[in-house]
């Protein structure tokens, strides 16, 4: 069994150059706009980062390779799947483009090979990986929503769903309290990032500039919440 697992991992690692080459060809196609290329690369980056966060949590919980793959996959593509179904964008993105699945599998293999003892990692690594994936996916969600409709409000909601959906499924499967339900600022960072993104577009900035403004604003707010334990006032009913 051990040899078979190693063989499978090596096959995934060997497949990495092919997957990366396919992604590169998509991005340098002369007929593809710069904004589309940037969006695709950022989407792949967010997929990989969110997959890492799923692998690290699975490692801390001592899951088997199948459990690791499931947790990484739902984290990386869960939110986007919900978004596409809500927008009627079917078949969903990872069925139309299997590079997403390859990125997840390769990321799982590399993370399991390189990170031997997830329990000994610094406490902040998982939240920071989650924050990076969150920021990227909020931007992706807003952009994709605006392709299918014109409402800024719906775009922001789709951004929040894309960013938070996979993490919620991951935490529920792992029997953890979802990060979005904890006291620290989480969904609020997504909303503010979506507002920055849609406002920049309304002001006439390019899609790339608007996307990056939303991503970085979400990321900075979320990292600040992690560092200084920022939270919103709680609602509590007293007896």
From Swiss-Prot:
The chain crosses the membrane at residues 38-58, 62-82, 86-106, 122-142, 153-173, 185-205. Its main location: membrane. Disulfide bonds: none annotated. Pfam families: Gly_transporter. The keyword Transmembrane helix applies. Signal peptide: none annotated. GO terms for cellular component: plasma membrane. Keywords: Cell membrane, Membrane, Transmembrane, Transmembrane helix. Coiled coil: none annotated. The keyword Transit peptide does not apply. It is a multi-pass membrane protein. It comes from the Bacteria. It is found in: Cell membrane. Belongs to the UPF0126 family. This is UPF0126 membrane protein VC_2382. It comes from Vibrio cholerae serotype O1 (strain ATCC 39315 / El Tor Inaba N16961). The lineage of its organism: Bacteria, Pseudomonadati, Pseudomonadota, Gammaproteobacteria, Vibrionales.
């Amino acid at each position: 069994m051990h040899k078979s697992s190693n063989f499978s991992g090596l096959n995934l690692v060997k497949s990495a150059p092919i997957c990366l080459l396919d992604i590169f060809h998509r991005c340098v196609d002369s007929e593809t706009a710069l904004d589309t290329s940037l969006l695709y690369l950022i989407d792949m980056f967010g997929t990989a980062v969110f997959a890492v966060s799923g692998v690290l949590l699975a490692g801390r919980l001592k899951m088997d390779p199948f459990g690791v793959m499931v947790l990484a996959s739902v984290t990386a593509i869960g939110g986007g799947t919900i978004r596409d179904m809500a927008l009627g964008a079917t078949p969903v993105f990872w069925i139309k483009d299997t590079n997403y699945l390859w990125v997840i599998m390769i990321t799982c293999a590399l993370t399991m090979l390189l990170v031997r003892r997830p329990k000994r990692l610094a406490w902040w690594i998982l939240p920071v990986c989650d924050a990076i994936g969150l920021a990227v996916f909020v931007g992706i969600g807003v952009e994709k929503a605006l392709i299918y409709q014109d409402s800024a409000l719906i775009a922001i909601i789709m951004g929040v769903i894309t960013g938070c959906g996979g993490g919620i499924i991951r935490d529920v499967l792992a029997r953890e309290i979802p990060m979005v339900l904890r006291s620290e600022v989480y969904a609020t960072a997504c909303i503010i990032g979506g507002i920055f993104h849609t406002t920049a577009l309304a002001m006439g900035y390019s899609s790339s500039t608007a996307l990056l403004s939303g991503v970085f604003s979400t990321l900075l707010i979320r990292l600040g919440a992690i560092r200084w334990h920022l939270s919103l006032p709680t609602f509590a009913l007293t007896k």
